Amino acid sequence: MAFKVGLLGLGTVGTGTVEILRDPAQRHPLLQELVIHKVGVRSLDKARSLNLSADLLTTDLDAIVTDPEIDIVVEVMGGLEPARSLILKALAHKKHVVTANKAAIARFGDEIFTAASEAGVYVLLEAAVGGGIPVIEPLKQSLCANRINTVIGIVNGTTNYILTRMQTEGGDFGEILADAQQLGYAEADPTADVDGLDAADKIAILASLAFSGRIKLSEVYCEGIRQIGAADIAYAEKLGFVIKLLAIAKRESDQQLQVRVHPTLVPKTHPLASVNDVYNAILIEGDPIGQVMFFGRGAGAGPTASAVVSDILNIAAILKVGRGQVTQADGTPLLDPLLACSHQHYCTIAPMSELVTRFYARFLTQDYPGVIGKLGTCFGDHQVSLESVVQAGIRDGLAEIVVVTHDVREGNFRKALDEIQRMTTVANIASVLRVL
Amino acid sequence: MAFKVGLLGLGTVGTGTVEILRDPAQRHPLLQELVIHKVGVRSLDKARSLNLSADLLTTDLDAIVTDPEIDIVVEVMGGLEPARSLILKALAHKKHVVTANKAAIARFGDEIFTAASEAGVYVLLEAAVGGGIPVIEPLKQSLCANRINTVIGIVNGTTNYILTRMQTEGGDFGEILADAQQLGYAEADPTADVDGLDAADKIAILASLAFSGRIKLSEVYCEGIRQIGAADIAYAEKLGFVIKLLAIAKRESDQQLQVRVHPTLVPKTHPLASVNDVYNAILIEGDPIGQVMFFGRGAGAGPTASAVVSDILNIAAILKVGRGQVTQADGTPLLDPLLACSHQHYCTIAPMSELVTRFYARFLTQDYPGVIGKLGTCFGDHQVSLESVVQAGIRDGLAEIVVVTHDVREGNFRKALDEIQRMTTVANIASVLRVL
Ligand SMILES: NC(=O)c1ccc[n+]([C@@H]2O[C@H](COP(=O)([O-])OP(=O)(O)OC[C@H]3O[C@@H](n4cnc5c(N)ncnc54)[C@H](OP(=O)(O)O)[C@@H]3O)[C@@H](O)[C@H]2O)c1
Ligand SMILES: NC(=O)c1ccc[n+]([C@@H]2O[C@H](COP(=O)([O-])OP(=O)(O)OC[C@H]3O[C@@H](n4cnc5c(N)ncnc54)[C@H](OP(=O)(O)O)[C@@H]3O)[C@@H](O)[C@H]2O)c1
């Protein structure tokens, strides 16, 4: 049997994908039954590292997603449009889809999965989160007996690289970002990474799978790492923490989830604390499995293509054994309930003001004896119980005060901060971070 | 639809399995379509923590595996016989099988998978390695596009617990084993764990999946942790290592694998070095994914039952969508080429003498100036190049000498040791360990 694959995109991931497809030795024998039928790109003139026969390449992507010969469309072009429209059109033409596009899935997952269900085809997306690290398929299949309670991930390699270097070198965010850009670890426009948007896309996808509901991306709280200073890294270190950009999804109650991305103080003994450089890791806590963690490279041509091609093979295996021969009343093939994303309702996400967490905050204040007392009283007035208040030093003639709270309601903490902000003795709230 | 499950065994894992099956809330909805049809045990009189209706329990296990109503047989009784015969009989009666029995699969995998292929049914075994940690399914599905080069695991919780305590407390093997037995972390008869046999079963299974061939268990080299002394842990620590019982499978060439279990010096910076206590982790290195690691609890009722029930659900999902409706010429359902273990040939395992590795060795010798020179010359004569030789101290009036080699052929190293053993100046080769 031969399964025909149409690729949309031949950039980093597309090239990695073709390289695996053309080199099946010592890989799964099913690879030999895959045929690259067409590859869609923007420009036919671009120099390519791969030696592809010219008649495979086309700029007519519409022709790929409607080609009656193609079984599986692989979307590795990225971006929102035309990626979204092409995926929907491929599904309408009853093609299975494999995609690495977290941005499109996080935003248009509802339309895309509804269209897939109606067409009786699969949309697989292992590459969209954690690069090659298996996490989508484990959530769907290997962990399906569990009640998932928490998913916590380091899912953005660029920010983890920057934070790791800030940690080891003691440098400031701006200079290390500039260096990371030079070295190719950060994009020229770093916004999606450093402002946490990419991580937010990914945790929205993971939360949707873990809690079997749809997630409105606009409800995912998202805070990046631009405001982290060398001082915060150093104080955190002294307190026994490292700072990581965490993407967190948590079942708060039967009705509500927390879904959020923000830099977080992580205890050094926590399994995520030692995940450094561009590595990603996803920690899942479920009942009755307890904690499991998945670790590896979250990006790059090889790891990402590993996930893309594995998804293609999983679909080829289904096609081969004729799964989908059982049909529903309207003739649509019945989809595997573990592999399809058939949930329809939206999860309710709790507002951040209701979050209960520990906080770390750093204040610059006038250097006189009553200040710590004033801060303490203000927090107390708002039911914010403190674990420690330390005058850590003097900076620019101001006293630097570091506060760590016990578990408190974020809403209460914010009200106290509002009041502190207005105190004439407080020059600056230099940083506010949550503690895991 | 309802899928009928027959359980063989209601001990630790069986009880955990029933607990999940009876509590589907917030778990995958497919759970609600599973029905426990029969549960086989040894004794009907035994007090059970579960309140199971009496007509479910039976001591007639044969009747379960031949019951025409049962779709899926779950073998969680353990041991070699009658487990093997019951599994084979279940397969002959075209029942899908889920098992947690690493001992039986490592020994009888060839018979069992051949019988499953002939019957056109699946044998799933996620629980057999790493408890709840997804590793079998990722190897079969999520990583299937890769050429796997290495699998290295900490796959035995008991030995990892003992070694971690030896590391943190500085105690000796014997006393910590006794304490571990008291605390329930080690069995009364600890042989299978501390002599590495359980880890050997597991790496044989992982190697078979990673390298798509069968493995003769008798060819798996296996060395336990009884001989590790507090002195070795302390010297390793000074050299920047921790000692872990590693199970290793490696592609040495197109023709040959290494498959081995032994205590190993692991650099403290290695991802496996910080896997402590009863936790397990499996590190897989593949092309093009690079390194990925899976971490979690490798045993216990909850984690193991998570894997067992997930396997049951995976089979139920297949049954539900009617996969297997495409049949071969003889009418047997065609099995999913990713999920079935259809490889027939045996892998060739290289003899240990051909292994190229670094070694650590500790000698007790007479305390006079020429001894280090004699050792060095002897190693040199056998092409064993040394990284360091240190007289580490005096023990019982003897000089304690610690040697670390560069990468050397194990055969050469052993010949040198034979010669050293016979030197009158050398009282004792106190320990020999490999270095990762
Ligand atoms: N790179 C990674 O490490 C990584 C990791 C995980 C997920 N992903 C995801 O994978 C996807 C692809 O990423 P990438 O890094 O491979 O991107 P890339 O290197 O920029 O490649 C994009 C490819 O798509 C083609 N393309 C883009 N827009 C097109 C259009 N409108 N019409 C026709 N062709 C178009 C480009 O054609 P030309 O070649 O002619 O310009 C190029 O071949 C993205 O969704 C990304 O988020 C990437
Ligand atoms: N425990 C773990 O953490 C763990 C982790 C991974 C894998 N596993 C594997 O899971 C399997 C089960 O382990 P377990 O710890 O659950 O064992 P267990 O607690 O000893 O339970 C064994 C069960 O099987 C029944 N049984 C045993 N031999 C029988 C026979 N000949 N006829 C009828 N019933 C028989 C026993 O019946 P009675 O109740 O009447 O005595 C008991 O219910 C083993 O293969 C083990 O290697 C266990």
Task: Describe each PLM feature range.
Chain A
Residues 1-93:
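N-terminal glycine-/serine-/threonine-rich beta1-alpha1-beta2 phosphate-ribose binding loop
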Residues 312, 318-436:
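A conserved regulatory-domain signal marking ACT and ACT-like small-molecule sensing domains
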Residues 83-89, 93, 102-140:
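Rossmann-fold NAD(P)-binding glycine/threonine-rich loop
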Residues 176-274, 279-281, 300:
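Substrate-binding/catalytic subdomain of NAD(P)-dependent oxidoreductase enzymes
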